[in-house]
Amino acid sequence: MEYLSSNKIAIIDLGASKTIQKELDEDLVKEKIGGAGITTALYEEYRDEDPIVLGTGLLTGTLAPASALGMVTAKSPVTGKICHAPFTLYGGVELKYCGFDYVVIKGSSPKPVYLWIHDGIADVNDGKEIWGKDVWISTDMIREVMGDPLIQILAIGKAGESESDFAQVCINYWASGDRWGFGKLFGQKKLKLVAMRGMSLLEIADPEGFVRKCKEFLSTIKSGPYAGKGGIGELSAAMGEDIRQWLEPIIHRHLSCFNTPFPTNTFVFLDEDPKLLKETEKKEPGFLITDVHGLLGYKKLGLSAAEACDLLRDCAKYGIDAVAVAELSQKAGKKKPDEIKKSLSGLKGSLESVGKGKFSPWAPSFTLSSDEWERRQAVAYLFGIHPIYALMSPEFSEEKLIELANLGTGLGFTSETLDKVIIDILK
């Protein structure tokens, strides 16, 4: 696969501590497009070896607006089905730039390990020094050892190590869109984390046409209803659950994921003045809210914004799904922060918030029907578009994404191709 691709798939056998590489077949891209289409195909190819598949969308890491998506595809311990969880911020683009479009992780290691994927190389390294550490400490340790603070990391905490059904794979220090318990799968495989760093380049079939169309696309988006807005508060308002006034006193700033026009993340200060302009001297001044549902769950328990965000921080360090914690705490009648924190290590119960679909409910439905939401998510996961922003922006038409894909690859994708792939991954 020559264009919009690193042209490599890493097959990592944790049991043997070995990695092999194979080319990304252009025929597979023509048939499955990318993203969840190919991660699903790779999962099926290695199904007998209980794989976890990391992947990127066809447009991930390009000038296409909101092309920030990376994904994890595996069998969910929560639903028992093959599901897809998103990771955004700069994780998706880093995976593609480090030299691999897809990574298949199969088998289990007899001892703790982590993966170091960089510059077209995938190493299986001893993880005994970071096993037992929380997500934040693990992330810091790897970045310090490698001497690079820009390394992107998918990590589990103690919830994953203890194989909790609600263990989450986190992105750097923060919650991801993993609502499927994929952190438990990492723990079962003795895989502590995946560290990614690279500076590859992507070739484009029609560079001038692709860049021109991306600029036109972005210009259209800038005149949309969310232009000039941003943050978790705006997301909640669009969902019909406005928390802006409740959250405002602790907001420090809003942050966008790679090349995403709308900042879907909000950083709050918990141990520092939120209006501080100079660099804080505190080591852990606050928390980046990346999941609106977790925040809303704690608000429904009657907590203050500061209490809710402090709990989100504890959940991220422990590597557990905050939405599950909030829902099960409500069922158990636990509404005090201290008693909720104490329950993290023994959390059990069934969830109603997960749903039965293939794509993470991390992305709000807004005003879409379930069928509309599912199709929009499928399109986002194929092309590598931020799943939340894809729902917020009607400008992301399937026709425009197909046009960008064809300018980028020259492969001649059609709406019929897209329909077929969507049907396949929704089976």
Task: Describe the function of each predicted region.
Residues 1-179, 183, 188, 192-201, ...:
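Protein-protein interaction/assembly regions in multi-subunit complexes
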Residues 13, 19, 28-31, 68, ...:
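Extended C-terminal regions of large enzymes
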